[in-house]
Amino acid sequence: MICTECENDAFDEEDDGYYYCQRCGVQVENLIQTGVDDGDLIGEGGGTQGALYNPKHRRTEPQPITPSQPRFTDDTSRYSQFKSQFESENGNKELPREVKRAPDSYVDKEPTEPVDFAAETLSYENYYDEARDRYVKAFLMMITYQCDALVDKFNVTPLIIGLVGPISLRYVALSGVYHKDWANNAIRDSEHQSEDGEVKDAKRLKRHKAEPRNIDGKRAVTIWFGILKKTMPLSSSLVISFLACHQAGAPVLPTDIVRWAREGKLPYLSCFLDIREQMGERSAACPVKVSIMARPFQVISAQMLEARASVIADTIGLPLPPVNFYGIASNYIKQLSIPEDKILDLARLIQNWSLPPELYLSTNEQKLPSRVCVMSILIVAIRMLYNINGLGVWERSLGFVNASDGDSETNSGTAEKATEFDTQELLKNLEAKYHEVAAETLESEKDLVSYLSLGKNEFFAGLEEDSPDDTYRIVDNLWNGYPKDEDIECLPKRGRDWDDDVSLNQLSLYDSRFSDGNNPCSSSSRRNESVSIGLDLSSSEHRESSSPEKLKEIAIKRLITDMGDDLFCYIPPRVKVKRLDYLQYVRKKEDGALIYAAHADYYILLRVCAKVAEIDVRNMHRGVLSFERRLAWIEKRIDQVLHLTRPLMTCKHCCDDGNIGEDQDD
């Protein structure tokens, strides 16, 4: 567009919607600012009835302004005189036009895609600074949300809010992501990892052609995010939250953190939704979405969480105390439904006396977790108080084992001690508690609606917005109609629910629920045997007349079967007991495999404690054996330590050149 008077190409837009020449001030004809899209200028039928002006421009009666009546008359007259004089001197030559200089960041080719007006070209430093800052900010926000949830939902001490700040900031500072050569080193490492080692042609896509890339053509932003996720994985947020709880002395276990994260009670899997509201989906220098950058896809195990907590503590130089034995042991005793007064006091005495190093967090993932040591101390205390030493208390409660004449006195003394602490009642309660804990399920797995809600809100959160079609909209419609149309009650997912309210004395293999025909893994011989027994004892009268010893024998066989499932061997009760001291078990090798042998009363105690501690029964047994060996070592050496005499030596600092042995004798 060129001015008809002075042939200038620079114009100014005024408030009335018209354009005026910057040099002569003449209004441009046939051009007005409408403030609407070009498509709005065409109305129905192809006419221009649909054209609308900008609302700020009033529709007034136009008054034509001719070039003979310019807007700036003084400037126009001076310019006319200057033009006529210049043309007369130069022979009617054209006036020199203004040369508009492009800025330094001018691109030779015009952009093919719309960009922001007055947008500055992003530098290499802008890209990696923005990518790093957004990831670190999202990481710290996730830790903050988790600590807030621990305090609000689980009544954890608010002290963790003050502890988690220094821990997380020191972890970020020592991770090396803010090193001055961090971005260049990441690009260089990615180039060294190329498969063929040859220089490839960097193919820049039109969509991301302005972004920096490595020599192989990979986007630098994706390379930096890959390094950030390896250096500071999102799972470290759970580790730091647990580390703050451990440092504050809260009785929070790694199993609790993992369980709460999987249930969605602790912000982790869907925490990126809250982070996106605070930070936005993306920025100009960081085109990676928050739903990709700050979204974890799995929850680490409790074993790995505890080991990584110790690694982070060593990295930042944080000295860790032992676990809160009193708080964790109290929670375990409540879950076991055992009287707390005597057991907890004895367990604390044993812990203070032995001071096991297993109560400290370890960097070794193959080592038994600290909660196993806590439960091992409780098992030893329960065995000492209730005299659970393979004396056949559980078998005698079934009336199956008869005491011989030779050991009648021993059994009578044992019975008196067992009656004092009610060992038989304890074993029955522990057995019922085991089946109760085994049948427990997560709140999200109790029914189908809860399970689907967990999947929608946690595991598949945010997929509705990213879906390019109406797939998830259809799912929402089906989801809204499900609770109304579903009238069938969803039974909870339970294991061995028939054992919950049935005591072991009343179990019978003759019941159809217990037949081996329901077990797909049973052999044909066992199935035929159970069927034959069921046919022989099909009548209810015959079942009632069956001997109690037969039923109790079946109960013992069932316990032996359960022990075999856990790779344990059943040991009959001890007879002719000569010493009523604490019984220690050992593992023996047979054909290259370790044999775990135990009595029935000890196994009943062991398996329920392992179930509460969420650990395998054999690993729980290993922890108990390790702690018992430590106690035996202390008892063996304590007499020697008490009778040690100081060596004869001279110390000028503490004895004033005196003889230590002589001072002791005096």
From Swiss-Prot:
Segments carrying the region annotation (Disordered) are 45-110, 189-208, 515-548
What is a GO molecular function of this protein? RNA polymerase I core promoter sequence-specific DNA binding
> Does this entry carry the keyword Amino-acid biosynthesis?
no
Q: Where is the composition biased (Polar residues)?
A: 78-89
Compartments, as annotated in UniProt: Nucleus, Nucleolus; Nucleus
According to the UniProt record, where is the region B-reader?
30-64
Which function does this protein serve?
Answer: Component of RNA polymerase I core factor complex that acts as a GTF2B/TFIIB-like factor and plays a key role in multiple steps during transcription initiation such as pre-initiation complex (PIC) assembly and postpolymerase recruitment events in polymerase I (Pol I) transcription. Binds rDNA promoters and plays a role in Pol I recruitment. Required for the development of the one-cell zygote and endosperm in embryos. Required for micropylar pollen tube guidance, but has no effect on ovule development and gametophytic cell fate specification.
**Protein name per UniProt:** TATA box-binding protein-associated factor RNA polymerase I subunit B
Organism equals: Arabidopsis thaliana
The primary gene name is MEE12
